[in-house]
Amino acid sequence: MKRMGLIMALMLAVSELFAAQTWKNETLRYTMYLGPIKAGEASLATKNIKRNGQDVVRMDLIARTTSAVEKIFSLNDTLTTIVNPKDAAPVYFQKHCFEGDDIVKERVTFSTTSDGRCSASMRKDYKDGRVKEKTATSKSQVYDMVSVVGFARAINTGNLYKGKRFSFKLADACEIIDEVLIYQGKEVVKINSKKFSCMVFRLVEPYQEKGKAKERDILTIYVSDDAQRTIVQMDIKFKVGSAKAKIIL
């Protein structure tokens, strides 16, 4: 359950998967369910602000579980990212999370090296006082758990076919990890008696097992196939069991 914060962040990040290239001041809200039980809520607020005299975009993700599910899992997460509105590249990221007994503070400072590589200077503070620090570089852009929306905005929806894959890199827990979004085709989804024709995407995490390449399912995303391109539902996979997150209409 400690990955719940990451999953909540990713599902909200891709909720602007097919948004316009302009950065709007707005707030998106979702409710999460375990079966019929309301498990929590999350919101992603986007604001255009000034930072050190420069125009930037600030995104704040807040995720909370309800008391009804806290014996199963609990989270109280606040994540903030600052991005460059011109290319959606992250500048700074911080995370303060309470997930069960785990209390974590993380921050990442992004920069560009002299040879054009993306550099991510990462720090993670544990509740017992331990500190982990690491700097990693990549030829491709590295995102944090919220600024990955910038990656999602760049996807061309005009050339989709079933099985098409979109790969990106994510800074999390002082590591750079690979994530993949796979287009699955179309489906009709019903939310509060309203039907949506949706494009379906599967988010997976590649890993190695006994020398063989495998993929771990994280969530399935249902995006309305209309001009709004709204994510109306996410099916979240755990090691045991699953949950659903539905848009608040």
Regions found by a protein language model. Name each.
Residues 4-13:
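Sec-dependent N-terminal signal peptides
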Residues 13-14, 46:
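Single-residue recognition of alpha-helix boundary sites
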Residues 15-19:
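Sec/Tat signal peptide C-region and signal peptidase I cleavage site
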Residues 20-114, 157-249:
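Acidic, serine/threonine-rich low-complexity disordered tracts
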Residues 108-153:
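Hydrophobic, well-structured mid-protein blocks that either form specific transmembrane helices
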